[in-house]
């Protein structure tokens, strides 16, 4: 097998690869949209119940989802493993691997359950206001019962995505929204014969939604002809530590990487919050818009993981490179559109969020910064997705650590707080951190893919 040195876009199959990746990514993007809408519904229900309820749910969801990034990121290694086995024609190994991933998800959920049990008593030491602590504690104690279902759900989701079937991610995402909205409303406000639980009610509704999503997904995988030959639930072996260890070796660095990136944005928000309510509100608007834009490259990156992994399993380095380049092409196009929309419509976008003149003025400027980091943000997440398809995760973890916490945070804090640039300085740090990450991740993929090509090419 020989690999052409010409750009993959010059090959006849490139347009087909772009189409395949795009179709694979679309349900994933919409699935992320459904997740964002769930957060929106939570805020609306809690906000109308009371300021203390909204604050409690905000604190509770932050303490749930930030550490939850580690198990979710760890389990995503299943996508590349399944995709590579599928590409290699070793589908009989997928069922046993999936069942070991279930054991891993059970262990990870147990750790999360313990975390959510021990954190609430510590909330006062974090400086949380006394009137918020009871609601946040009740929310966390309720939602923790859904964590096992949540990890099982992601395990099944990543299996399905590795098999090139992403539609359930979208359907179950919006299905969860249809469950959460009425149940959350009933339990929070005490409607339809239920007692009023406030913030705890939203935690209960979230846990119920998690179990409904996981149960429906399991039933679908059990009954669907598409997965029948995998015999996913034919039997359950005991834990096989070698297989679980392999999933951990590949997946844990992903979980840590995702945690470091999420931590960068959360710490940035906390530091900006120290500057004043106007600065905090403006930053929240800008970062919310940026997160909406990020859903597209994130979905494309997940699809690229699948396509790259499948090509690696087939032993086809040319297809692997073509899959990666297709992902880059889509992301560059979508990020160009996002950046253009932010540059041309930043004032109008801010107007949807607030009527406060001071907040709007600063948020409008920050959206210009958000437009600037569209390209590095898209490239870094796409490169990380392509590297996951190669099962190259350990070095990217250190690259992310350096980029976000060795470059982005020190520069942002130095400019924003040290030199008095305020939120603008913090956003410069975000841009530089993401830019360095995009360069290093891109170079790492180039190096790793070339090494893989050399091992396959005679």
Swiss-Prot record:
The keyword ATP-binding does not apply. Keywords: Antiport, Cell inner membrane, Cell membrane, Ion transport, Membrane, Transmembrane, Transmembrane helix, Transport. One of its GO terms (molecular function) is antiporter activity. InterPro entries: MATE_fam, MATE_MdtK. It is a multi-pass membrane protein. It is found in: Cell inner membrane. One of its GO terms (biological process) is monoatomic ion transport. Its main location: membrane. Belongs to the multi antimicrobial extrusion (MATE) (TC 2.A.66.1) family. NCBIfam families: matE. Multidrug efflux pump. This is Probable multidrug resistance protein NorM. The lineage of its organism: Bacteria, Pseudomonadati, Pseudomonadota, Gammaproteobacteria, Lysobacterales.
